């Protein structure tokens, strides 16, 4: 759950402590528009949060689209209506390789379109009786201004359909980018916030304590370009990490939410590690000591083509990126209690930037092949064509290069998935690795898709129809380029269907049919005899249940 609905709820409750708030996801509204209409009809105010600043693919939910924003107003019967979120400021994109825009008719469909900070503007609207002269571009002056709204809005999490086990709460640590001093990356919106403005540790802990008191158990420190520089005293383009501040942040989080199950991070700037290796290593060690395993440090490498790096003022050249990947591996590759390595890098590549040629795709591919050949691990490789935003330095360049290179991008993506992603997943979660706390999310025929809760969790396909929303321990049995296959443990051989048995390494259709015909088995020896190859049984011996 992002900060928007929680901040907005906190602003409303701060202005009117007796307000009765209802929160529904966009997917709930799509599935049951009549209920949403009846809730709106009984309300004074309806707020739609819409849009994203980074395009992506989603498993069991998706953000509000331009089509949603254009059609939903017909169902909003409240006296006042508000549109806010990234779409209200930057518009809607049609995915990667496009330019965002606000549909011409959209502003006329809502009473207020908030391009500033929603919680600040909505608080002012309520206290001023929805004055039409309210400045909808208003932004908070300091990051700490949000602390009271963040804490007061925490109880709204109870209304999320995935609460509590399947819900992870995004927690903002700061906004702004030190690289804004030199313009920042050409495509990024973060420099628009100026230099970093850190929230206080006390303010963040207060929010997390309120969330924990409301029942939240999963958290992610997100919404910042580089967590390593949290609390840094430097005021330059590449500030040195403050390991003590990072430790205080995570220690305070643990104290505020002592029963938390997940504490993960998001973005880290690879150039920080390259230029400040000692301080970065110390800060990373504090993170690994105090977070929960299965964590991912998303590195904005963006391109391994040095010409693209130079033309777009990107963060790091390939040498520095490779160094950062190596450092994170050295500290975070130990496997944790949930079966995943503690902390691995995730690599982000952006395509369609000025300076991109056919050689760019080759440079990115061979960069990742080198990572693989060095024996290093990355959790994910995120390849996306840029989404051009207004007010960024790339706005005047547009999306023409992304459209021109679309066919190159698709071919390159397929090559990266086959030649890098698949062998990398085999390294990150070898066959027979047991992942703990895998939650079922989506059923497609006789396949159930599931994931652990966390930052960029690994997608696990289970070849059986299972109830959704349950937590399982799963043994990994096969690897694809973007997901893995597995079975719940213990392996109940006497109860499994044909497809489940066939998914076990070494058991094909003939052996699976034999097992079904000759079961139930009362001992491992009986099972071993039926398999006619003892080596098949050896890796799963401790995982079998013959009841």
Task: Please identify what each model-predicted range represents.
Residues 508-509:
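Small-residue hinge/turn detector
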Residues 20-144, 437:
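Glycine-rich beta-alpha loop elements in corrinoid/cobalamin-binding modules
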Residues 403-491:
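Terminal RNA-binding accessory module
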Residues 209-356, 367:
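Conserved SAM/AdoMet-binding glycine-rich loop
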């Amino acid at each position: 759950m992002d900060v928007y609905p929680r901040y907005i709820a906190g602003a409303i409750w701060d202005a009117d402590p007796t307000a009765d708030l209802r929160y529904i996801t966009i997917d709930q509204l799509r599935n049951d528009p009549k209920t949403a209409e009846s809730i709106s009809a009984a309300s004074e105010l309806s707020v739609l949060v819409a849009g994203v600043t980074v395009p992506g693919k989603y498993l069991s939910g998706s953000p509000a689209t331009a089509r949603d924003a254009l059609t939903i107003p017909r169902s909003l019967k409240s006296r006042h209506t508000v549109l806010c979120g990234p779409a209200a400021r930057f518009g809607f994109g049609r995915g990667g390789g496009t330019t965002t825009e606000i549909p011409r008719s959209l502003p006329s469909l809502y009473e207020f379109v908030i391009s500033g900070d929603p919680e600040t503007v909505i608080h002012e609207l309520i206290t001023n009786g929805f004055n039409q002269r309210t400045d909808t571009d208003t932004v908070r002056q300091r990051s700490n201004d949000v602390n009271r709204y963040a804490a007061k809005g925490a109880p709204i999490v109870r209304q999320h359909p995935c609460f509590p086990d399947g819900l992870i709460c995004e927690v903002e640590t700061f906004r702004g980018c030190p690289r804004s001093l030199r313009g920042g990356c050409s495509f990024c919106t973060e420099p628009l916030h100026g230099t970093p403005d850190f929230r206080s540790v006390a303010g963040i802990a207060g929010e997390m304590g309120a969330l924990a008191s409301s029942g939240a158990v999963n958290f992610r420190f997100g919404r910042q370009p580089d967590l390593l520089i949290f609390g840094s005293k430097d005021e330059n383009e590449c500030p040195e990490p403050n390991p003590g501040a990072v430790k205080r942040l995570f220690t305070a989080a643990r104290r505020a939410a002592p029963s938390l199950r997940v504490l993960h991070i998001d973005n880290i700037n690879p150039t920080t590690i390259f230029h400040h290796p000692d301080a970065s290593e110390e800060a990373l060690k504090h993170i690994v000591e105090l977070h929960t395993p299965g964590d991912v440090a998303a590195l904005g490498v963006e391109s391994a083509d040095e010409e693209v790096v130079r033309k777009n003022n990107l963060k790091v050249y390939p040498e520095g990126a490779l160094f950062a990947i190596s450092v994170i591996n050295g500290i975070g590759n130990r496997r944790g209690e949930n079966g995943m390595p503690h902390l691995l890098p995730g690599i982000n590549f952006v395509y369609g930037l000025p300076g991109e040629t056919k050689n760019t795709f080759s440079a990115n591919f061979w960069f990742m092949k080198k990572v693989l050949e060095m024996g290093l691990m990355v959790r994910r490789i995120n390849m996306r064509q840029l989404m051009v935003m207004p007010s960024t330095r790339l706005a005047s360049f547009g999306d023409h290069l992304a459209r021109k290179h679309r066919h190159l991008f698709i071919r390159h993506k397929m090559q990266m998935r086959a030649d890098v992603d698949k062998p990398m997943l085999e390294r990150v979660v070898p066959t027979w690795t047991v992942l703990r706390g895998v939650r079922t999310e989506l059923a497609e025929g006789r396949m159930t898709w599931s994931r652990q809760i966390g930052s960029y969790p690994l997608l696990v396909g289970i070849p059986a129809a299972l109830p959704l929303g349950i937590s399982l321990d799963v043994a990994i049995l096969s690897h694809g380029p973007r997901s893995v296959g597995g079975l719940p443990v213990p392996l109940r051989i006497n109860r499994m269907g044909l497809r489940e048995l066939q998914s076990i390494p070494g058991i094909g259709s003939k052996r699976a049919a034999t097992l079904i015909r000759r079961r139930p088995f009362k001992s491992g020896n009986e099972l071993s005899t039926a398999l006619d190859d003892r080596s098949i049984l050896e890796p799963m011996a401790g995982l079998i249940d013959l009841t």
